[in-house]
């Protein structure tokens, strides 16, 4: 399907990104991927020359086997990376939970932070269903324990981030 989409090249811009996204959506639709965790963009970018050569060989020589080998190698490599990241995230979560064992409100915030690593005091109020001072206390505890880092530099409306989560999933927090 990806090769066919690339061959049609229906848009002036964005065909590559959309074609790679279609891979993930197709696998989800077919029940082969329960969550959108497999993105081949990094693999394709790292093997760009092979990618284009193999796409061209499908068009010129009908070399589907070469294309499929490349594609399966990419799925394998990215899948192993995703499993490694998931393992590291579970280890990080357990390490943090151990440090907060006797702090139920902070533990509840921690669970939320592993769904979305950004937190504000207002969000903590909603998540915990507590007053502003109680929410602030839970956020400050996570900050003192080195789990949250304030990223705005503001006095009011501060936003906090769990940078170790972002580092683990290899995303840059705070535009860095």
Residue ranges, per PLM feature:
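Phosphate/pyrophosphate-binding active-site loops
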Residues: 1-86, 91
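Alpha-helix C-caps/helix-loop-beta hinges
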Residues: 8, 116, 145-146
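Short alpha-helical segments that sit at the start of domains
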Residues: 82-110
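Conserved, hydrophobic alpha-helical core segments of structured domains
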Residues: 101-109, 115, 132, 156
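Short, cationic-aromatic polyanion-contact patches
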Residues: 102-103, 150-174
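Short acidic, hydrophobic short linear motifs in intrinsically disordered regions
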Residues: 110, 115-128
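Basic amphipathic alpha-helical segments that dock to polyanions
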Residues: 113, 135-145
């Amino acid at each position: 399907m990806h090769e066919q989409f690339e061959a049609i090249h229906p848009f002036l811009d964005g065909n590559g990104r959309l074609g790679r996204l279609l891979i993930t959506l197709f696998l989800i639709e077919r029940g082969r991927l329960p969550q959108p965790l497999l993105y081949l963009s990094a693999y394709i970018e790292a093997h760009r020359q092979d990618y284009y050569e193999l796409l061209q060989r499908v068009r010129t020589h009908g070399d589907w086997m070469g294309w499929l080998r490349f594609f399966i190698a990419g799925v394998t490599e990215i899948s192993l990376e995703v499993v490694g990241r998931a393992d590291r995230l579970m280890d990080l979560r357990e390490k943090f939970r151990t440090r907060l064992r006797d702090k139920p409100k902070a533990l509840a915030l921690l669970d939320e932070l592993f769904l979305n690593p950004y937190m504000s005091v207002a969000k903590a109020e909603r998540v915990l269903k507590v007053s502003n001072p109680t929410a602030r206390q839970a956020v400050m505890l996570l900050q003192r324990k080195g789990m949250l880092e304030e990223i705005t530099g503001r006095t009011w409306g501060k936003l906090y981030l769990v940078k170790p989560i972002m580092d683990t999933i290899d995303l840059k927090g705070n535009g860095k």
